[in-house]
């Protein structure tokens, strides 16, 4: 609820989540981060298109590696990482499978690789008492909450989408 919060959007892709946060909370500063230069270009376009320059910045970074930023820098970290299990990608609807690059979908054998990587490498960028929020795939909320608890985060909870599916998992540092 902190109005002047610093927010990090990991695996930001087009930047829609971070842009929505920046738009809804004008005092907030958002950093969009992705491993893909092409995704960062799309993010820049979306930031400019929505008049969010000056409040949203960009960081090219790989969540599977140590972060290039200081410990405790962010009040909120959000991420919609790749979460489709590798073997499920071929069964996706063509409108998804043929539109998105495979690396933007493939979450590893169980779909949880990026959650593990973010918790291992990036949880330290969240200030004490700050929050981590993940979008999760169907039937992944319980596993992701367990990973968060094992990583030392507290108050792991899930939020259901309009279909009643646990779609977002949150926890506090």
Language-model-detected regions and their locations in the chain:
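Conserved SAM/SAH cofactor-binding pocket of Class I
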Residues: 1-91
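Glycine-centered flexibility sites
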Residues: 9-18, 61, 82, 107-111, ...
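Class I S-adenosylmethionine-dependent transferase superfamily signal
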Residues: 21, 96, 118-122
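Structural signal for short hydrophobic segments within the conserved structured cores
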Residues: 57-59, 103, 157
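Alpha/beta-hydrolase-fold catalytic nucleophile elbow
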Residues: 80, 99, 135
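C-terminal beta-strand of the catalytic ATP-binding
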Residues: 83, 172-173
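Mobile active-site "lid"/loop adjacent to the S-adenosyl-L-methionine
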Residues: 83-113
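Conserved Class I SAM-dependent methyltransferase catalytic core
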Residues: 109-172
């Amino acid at each position: 609820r902190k109005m002047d919060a610093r927010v990090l959007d990991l695996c930001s892709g087009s930047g829609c989540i971070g842009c929505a946060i920046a738009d809804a909370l004008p005092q907030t500063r958002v950093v969009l981060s992705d491993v893909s230069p092409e995704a960062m270009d799309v993010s820049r376009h979306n930031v400019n298109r929505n008049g969010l320059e000056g409040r949203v910045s960009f960081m090219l970074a790989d969540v599977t590696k140590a972060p290039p930023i200081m410990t405790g820098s962010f009040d909120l970290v959000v991420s919609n990482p790749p979460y489709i299990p590798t073997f499920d990608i071929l069964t996706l609807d063509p409108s998804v499978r043929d539109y998105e690059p495979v690396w933007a979908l493939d979450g590893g054998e169980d779909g949880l690789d990026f959650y593990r990587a973010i918790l291992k490498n990036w949880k330290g960028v969240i200030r004490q008492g700050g929050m981590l929020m993940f979008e999760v795939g169907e039937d992944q909320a319980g596993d992701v909450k367990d990973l968060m608890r094992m990583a030392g985060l507290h108050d792991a909870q899930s939020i259901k989408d309009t279909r009643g599916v646990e779609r977002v998992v949150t926890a506090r540092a």
